[in-house]
Every structure is written in C-alpha cells, then in structure tokens.
From Swiss-Prot:
Key words of the record: Amidation, Amphibian defense peptide, Antibiotic, Antimicrobial, Secreted
Main location: secreted
Cellular component terms (Gene Ontology): extracellular region
Secreted keyword on record: yes
Subcellular location, record wording: Secreted
Species of provenance: Bombina orientalis
Record protein name field: Bombinin-like peptide 4
GO BP term, example: defense response to bacterium
Length: 25
C-alpha cells in the first residue's frame, strides 16, 4: 500500500542521512 511505500522511502532516506552524517563525523 501507499503507507508501506512511504515507510520504505522514509527508511531509505534516514539510512542515507545517517551514512552522510557518519562520513562527516
């Protein structure tokens, strides 16, 4: 469903942000 798609995208975005921050620190 749409909710699952949004959750999946959100998790991907959060993982991307976490990886980006890890590279800075």
């Amino acid at each position: 469903g749409i909710g699952a798609a949004i959750l999946s995208a959100g998790k991907s975005i959060i993982k991307g942000l976490a990886n980006g921050l890890a590279e800075h620190f």
